[in-house]
Amino acid sequence: MNKINIGDILDFTTEKSARKAIFKEGRLDTGLLLYAPGQTTPDHKHSDIDEVFYVISGEGTITINNEEMRLKEKDIIFSPHGETHGFNNTSSANWVVLQIKIRD
């Protein structure tokens, strides 16, 4: 069993959004997506990965198959493999999203 304090791995000093790995075991891969205001991840898709995104703090938008949706603290969303998705922190605060990847 491993324990990590999320506060210990938050880092918003990079120019681009960042992913901080948490745990990786077998088909499961978890990490934090960190977005300072204005930072984005371009639309992309995975052919063999389902993903769950849970907003820990802040708010922003996720675009799924060209449909934009606002996400805020405590929102959770599932993105199955093959679905196009991207992120944009449109707020004035940092945005922290827990990402859970499940490989086929």
Where are these regions (language model features)?
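A short, N-terminal "cap"/entry segment at the start of jelly-roll beta-barrel domains
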Residues: M1-L28
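Well-ordered beta-strand scaffold positions
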Residues: G26-L28, E59, E67-M69
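Conserved short histidine dyad/triad with adjacent acidic residue
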Residues: G31-H46
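Short beta-strand segments in beta-sandwich/barrel cores
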Residues: T40-T41, G58-I64
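Glycine- and acidic-residue-biased ligand/ion/polar-headgroup-sensing regions
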Residues: D48-D50, V55-G60
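Short acidic-glycine-tyrosine-enriched beta hairpin
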Residues: E67-H81
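Ligand-binding loop in jelly-roll beta-barrel domains
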Residues: H81-D104
